[in-house]
Structures are given as C-alpha cells and as structure tokens.
C-alpha cells in the first residue's frame, strides 16, 4: 500500500498574442485597420501584449509501505542473526566451561578413588599378612572383618537415607541446597558431606590396621565397608545420575538405570522428596506407588542416552 503526498509549485509563463490578418477580421468591429503592422504602428502596444499567467504543477510523492516493511524486516533479520551469533558464542563458552568443570572433577575423583582404593587394598593385604605370620589363620577375625565390610556397606545406605531426610533436608539444608541448584564450578558445598563421611572410615581403618584382635578386625571391616559404599555412591550418584564425569559401561547396568531414574525423581519432588536413599531408591518408590513414574523416567533417560 502506498501513501501519496501532494506538493504544489508555482511558475510563470509568458504568452504573446498577435492577430494575424489571414485569420479573419479583428475582434474589434468598429475601426478596421487597413494598414500593415509596422514597428511605428500606434497600436503596436495593444497588439503585442505580454501577459503572465500563473501555472501550477502538482507533484505526487509516493511512499511505498511495502518497501518500508521489507526494510524493517531486513533490519529484524540482521538483529536476529546477531543475536543468534551471540547465543552461539555463549553456548560454546558454556559448553567449554562445563567440559572444563567435568574434567576437573574427574581428575579429583580419579585421584581420590585411586588413592583410597590403593590404600584400602594394601591395608587389607598387609593386615592379613601380619595376622598369619605365626602360622595360625585367625578365621574368626577374618570373618568378622568380611562381615562388617558387607554390613557397613549396606548399613550406609540406610544411614544415608535417614541423614538425607532428617538432616540434609532439614537443619543442614543450607549446605545441601547447593546440590539442588545449578552448579557453578566443578564443586559444590554439598561435597563436604563426602569428606565428613570419610573421616570415620579413615579412623576405623587406621585403628584396625595397627592393632590385632577381633575388635580391631571388626573396626577394620567397618571402615572398609564405608569406603566401598562411598566409592559406589560417587560413581552412581555423581557420575551416572548427575553426569559429573563419564562412567562407561556402568550406565548400561539395568538396575543402576533404575537407581539413576529414581534419584532423578527425588530432584523433581513428585513424591515429596522420595526416594531419599540411593541404591534402594526404586524400593522406596514402590512403597509410595511411584513405579509408573519410575518406568517413564527410565524410558526417558534411555532415549536421551541413545539420542546422544
């Protein structure tokens, strides 16, 4: 659609009027002229007359709204392209930062895991080696160590469930809250709980390693069980669920997929925070009627893994 603008300009034009004898008589019927027209004729002033008439010129200036719309659309396209470039740059920076954070946490996890695992293996080997130096095999002590190792690992699941609900989501929420928010940097304040749980494990291992007898053997087993649980918790919770580092074939274990899906439902708070435990999370959801949602979450995570 075009809009019209009208402008007027005024000009003047000179018109000369002269009566020709060949066109008939003059319009004045009273005194016909028989003399030819000469420069000395007395009527020359009336014959040759100069009259200026005003002349108006109308100019139409058209504004093409379509062209204006196209121009504005072109500006919008340029702005959108600039915004897309800025968004792409920010996305690339965010991905690079996330990659750096994952690498940093992976290095820390590998170093701590390798250090703790190697110390635990060496402690188990040398402890039983010293126990059998006299030729006698302390079966009761060895059985106690093994039993407490398994018992402590299983017991830590129930301890973690209780502490998670009664402490971390209550009086210690100011620390645990960092785990329920987008993480900034490779670490979060919630990681302090891993260090807190490592303190009794190290103390029990130390006492059981440097002492002989049934009680030191039980303490050594308890410290070993806490250590094993902490390692498994880190790989499943931090690696498989929150993808803070790659876990490899661990992600293909069917039950661990359910565990990861159950913990994702904990963060969604669909069942008032249930499950609070980790490895027995699917069982907790079954108790509150959340198996259907659990299956949906498992399928969603499976499609995501296959798509990526």
Curated annotation (Swiss-Prot):
Chain span(s) of sequence motif Histidine box-3: 237-242
Q: For this UniProt entry, which segments traverse the membrane?
A: 105-125, 139-159, 191-211, 215-235
Where the protein is mainly located, per its record? plastid
| Annotated InterPro entries | BETA-OHASE-like
Which GO BP terms sit in this record? Answer: carotenoid biosynthetic process
The short sequence motif called Histidine box-2 sits at 176-180
Transit peptide region:
1-59
The annotated modulation of its activity is: Inhibited by o-phenanthroline and 8-hydroxyquinoline.
Q: What's the domain of life for this entry?
A: Eukaryota
> Where is the protein found, in the record's own terms?
Plastid, Chloroplast membrane
Reaction catalysed? all-trans-beta-carotene + 4 reduced [2Fe-2S]-[ferredoxin] + 2 O2 + 4 H(+) = all-trans-zeaxanthin + 4 oxidized [2Fe-2S]-[ferredoxin] + 2 H2O; all-trans-beta-carotene + 2 reduced [2Fe-2S]-[ferredoxin] + O2 + 2 H(+) = beta-cryptoxanthin + 2 oxidized [2Fe-2S]-[ferredoxin] + H2O; beta-cryptoxanthin + 2 reduced [2Fe-2S]-[ferredoxin] + O2 + 2 H(+) = all-trans-zeaxanthin + 2 oxidized [2Fe-2S]-[ferredoxin] + H2O
What are the GO MF terms of this UniProt record?
beta-carotene 3-hydroxylase activity; hydrolase activity; metal ion binding
Keyword terms of this UniProt record: Carotenoid biosynthesis, Chloroplast, Hydrolase, Iron, Membrane, Metal-binding, NAD, Oxidoreductase, Plastid, Transit peptide, Transmembrane, Transmembrane helix
Regarding the membrane, this protein is recorded as:
Multi-pass membrane protein
The entry's function note states: Nonheme diiron monooxygenase involved in the biosynthesis of xanthophylls. Specific for beta-ring hydroxylations of beta-carotene. Produces beta-cryptoxanthin and zeaxanthin. Uses ferredoxin as an electron donor.
Family per record: Belongs to the sterol desaturase family.
Q: What is this protein called?
A: Beta-carotene hydroxylase 2, chloroplastic
């Amino acid at each position: 659609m075009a809009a019209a603008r009208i402008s007027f300009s005024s000009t003047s034009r000179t018109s000369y009027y002269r009566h020709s004898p060949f066109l008939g008589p003059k319009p004045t019927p009273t005194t016909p002229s028989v003399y030819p027209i000469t420069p000395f004729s007395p009527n020359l002033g009336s014959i040759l007359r100069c009259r200026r008439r005003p002349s108006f010129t109308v100019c139409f200036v058209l504004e093409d709204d379509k062209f204006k719309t196209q121009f504005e659309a072109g500006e919008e396209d340029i702005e959108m392209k600039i915004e897309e470039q800025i968004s792409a740059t920010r996305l690339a920076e965010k991905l690079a930062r996330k990659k750096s954070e994952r690498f940093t946490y992976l290095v820390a996890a590998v170093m701590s895991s390798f250090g703790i695992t190697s110390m635990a293996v060496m402690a188990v080997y040398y402890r039983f080696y010293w126990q059998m130096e006299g030729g006698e095999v302390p079966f009761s002590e060895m059985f106690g160590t093994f039993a407490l190792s398994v018992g402590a690992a299983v017991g830590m699941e129930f301890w973690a469930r209780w502490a998670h609900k009664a402490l971390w989501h209550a009086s210690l929420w100011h620390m645990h809250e960092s785990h329920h928010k987008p993480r900034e940097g490779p670490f979060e304040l919630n990681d302090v709980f891993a260090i807190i749980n490592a303190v009794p494990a190290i103390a029990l291992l130390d006492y059981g390693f440097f002492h002989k007898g049934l009680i030191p053997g039980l303490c050594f087993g308890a410290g070993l069980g806490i250590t094993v649980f902490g390692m498994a918790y880190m790989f499943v919770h931090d690696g498989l669920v929150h993808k803070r580092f790659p876990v490899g074939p661990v992600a293909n274990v069917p039950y661990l997929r359910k565990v990861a899906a159950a913990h994702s439902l904990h963060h969604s708070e669909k069942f008032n925070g249930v499950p609070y435990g980790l490895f027995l999370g699917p069982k907790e959801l079954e108790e509150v009627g959340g198996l259907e949602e659990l299956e949906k979450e498992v399928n969603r995570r499976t499609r995501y893994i296959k798509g990526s």
